[in-house]
Amino acid sequence: SPANYATAIQIRERAQQEIDQLSDAQYAYLLEQLIDQHLPIRFDMQLASDYLQMSERHLRRSLLLEGISFQQIRQTVLERKAKQMLKNNLSIGDISQALGFSEVREFRRAFKRWTGQAPSVYKNGTE
């Protein structure tokens, strides 16, 4: 109906205004939340820009102004989740799968790159 259409347009415009008012720091925070909520899906820059209804270029520039990249945000989320899961005694295989890694080996390599130690060493150090 025309009334529903008008309401939908108003909601869309209001959402766009809120997105436009976000500061760069809020973009980073929002991206952290989106990446976390969509695990184990690999929430990439294209999905993020589609979700935020902006171009990848605009999102990339907004993050650049803050001095952070999408990849850094994604890595921060994955590292934080991995550490949390290791502390909760989840298996490395389960963690790897929950974070969207295709292989355990890939997760182990990423974790070592992030922290400087293997997941098993980190897990034993937190017990």
Per-region residue spans from a language model:
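Extended mid-to-C-terminal alpha-helical interaction segments
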Residues: 1-127
